[in-house]
């Protein structure tokens, strides 16, 4: 099945969206604008929410995006902004599902939310690691049809804050918001030699609830914990967000 693609950029939010119906682009863009406004208004009144590296206590009347970010950060013991990209992706996909989308992928800086009635292959982009571009994950339609998250944190690629040095920490979870915060938390433990760093990451992953599995790469080394999708070989070398196939 062929999907329609469009890049949507609104201030710091830059997403690659793939949908089965081009009419959904307008809905997605409105959702991003609305949620950005909600987040910006909240931060203007609660500036610590933007800068803290620790979970932030919120009130019951906080906007949905703030609640998702706060809950995900508490689950992983990181600051709420660690979940911002995955949360935007998740909210977009849920909005599209409510508007009869059958297959949609929203990628925001390596943090992906998706839903599909087809299997989807997501390629692994891990910076300079020799593993990068050679492996992909086959996500089964039964697992992703109502929404799913695949989020990656890196200490060597991108502008997001990470206190570790892993080339990639990919987390799989029902919620992209949960996966995003978890990936940041786990990636912070990637210190020491490659094998030490990977083991520390996997130990931290076992302390985090609500995630299905984790795949970590550090140079030519890799490790996993929990249940991850089937690994397959791929020859794709594009950036993480461009490596999607419907099968």
From Swiss-Prot:
NCBIfam families noted in UniProt: PRK04334.1-1 (NF003321)
Protein's name according to its UniProt entry: UPF0280 protein Mevan_0550
Gene3D superfamilies named among the record's database cross-references: ApbE-like domains
Family indicated by similarity: Belongs to the UPF0280 family.
Listed InterPro entries: ApbE-like_sf, MA1715-like, UPF0280
Leader sequence segment: none
Coiled coil: none
Source organism: Methanococcus vannielii (strain ATCC 35089 / DSM 1224 / JCM 13029 / OCM 148 / SB)
């Amino acid at each position: 099945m062929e999907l329609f693609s469009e890049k949507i950029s609104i201030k710091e939010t830059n997403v690659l969206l793939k949908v089965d119906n081009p009419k959904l682009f307008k809905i997605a863009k409105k959702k991003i604008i609305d949620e950005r406004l909600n987040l910006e208004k909240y931060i203007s009144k609660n500036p610590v929410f933007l800068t803290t590296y620790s979970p932030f206590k919120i009130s019951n009347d906080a906007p949905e995006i703030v609640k998702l970010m706060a809950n995900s950060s508490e689950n992983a013991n990181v600051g709420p902004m660690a979940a911002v990209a995955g949360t935007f992706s998740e909210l977009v996909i849920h909005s599209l599902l409510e508007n009869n989308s059958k297959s949609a992928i929203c990628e925001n800086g390596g943090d992906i939310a998706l839903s599909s009635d087809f299997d989807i292959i997501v390629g692994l982009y891990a910076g300079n690691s020799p593993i990068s571009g050679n492996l992909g994950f086959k996500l089964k339609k039964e697992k992703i049809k109502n929404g799913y998250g695949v989020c990656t944190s890196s200490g060597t690629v991108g502008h997001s804050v990470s206190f570790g040095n892993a080339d990639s920490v990919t987390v799989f979870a029902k919620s992209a918001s949960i996966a995003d915060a978890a990936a940041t938390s786990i990636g912070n433990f990637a210190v020491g030699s490659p094998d030490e760093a990977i083991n520390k990451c996997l130990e931290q992953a076992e302390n985090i609830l609500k995630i299905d599995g984790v795949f970590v790469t550090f140079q030519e080394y890799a490790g996993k914990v929990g249940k991850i999708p089937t690994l397959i070989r791929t020859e794709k070398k594009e950036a993480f967000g461009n490596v999607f196939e419907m099968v």
